């Protein structure tokens, strides 16, 4: 949610409320399970989302990698197949998928950094593995390998609304 807001995009208040409620519930459960946990520092990891700004060798990327015809978040949302059981139970969450884009724009080594549910991780990997080639990053006018971390949100209400819109558009065409 914070990432979406930082990009200047809108997010439903309900989605923010659901995410905050889930985080509070998780914190409450963690406190019950381990009452002294707050005394020990806990590192969960903070991942920067989007393209890495430097190459593996440390050079500053001048032109970031991108999909040619569509924003990567729009592509992911359009390709998403929500796990049926999780959709039925209104389970929301996310997956963070990191991958490398090679000099030809081919995705290499996609892997999950973090996810709230194994099925969300599987779906995020499927989406990334099926992506078309990217326009690679450039340094000094030459294509270079670069890393990208994609945040894939799973919001059941939003997904259901998008399905309804698609169904209406399809029925208009027929």
Task: Give short role names for the model-derived ranges.
Residues 1-174:
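Charge-biased low-complexity segments
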């Amino acid at each position: 949610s914070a990432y979406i807001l930082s990009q200047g995009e809108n997010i439903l208040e309900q989605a923010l409320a659901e995410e905050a409620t889930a985080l509070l519930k998780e914190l409450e459960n963690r406190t019950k399970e381990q009452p002294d946990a707050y005394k020990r520092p806990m590192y969960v990891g903070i991942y920067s989302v989007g393209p890495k700004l430097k190459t593996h060798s440390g050079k500053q990327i001048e032109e970031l990698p991108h999909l040619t015809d569509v924003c990567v978040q729009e592509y992911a949302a359009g390709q998403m197949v929500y796990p049926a059981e999780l959709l039925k139970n209104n389970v929301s969450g996310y997956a963070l998928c990191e991958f490398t884009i090679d000099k030809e724009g081919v995705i290499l080594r996609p892997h999950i950094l973090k996810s709230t549910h194994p099925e969300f991780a599987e779906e995020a990997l499927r989406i990334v593995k099926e992506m078309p080639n990217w326009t690679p990053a450039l340094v000094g006018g030459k294509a270079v390998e670069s890393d990208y971390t994609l945040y894939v949100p799973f919001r059941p209400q939003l997904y259901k609304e998008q399905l309804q819109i698609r169904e209406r558009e399809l029925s208009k065409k027929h």
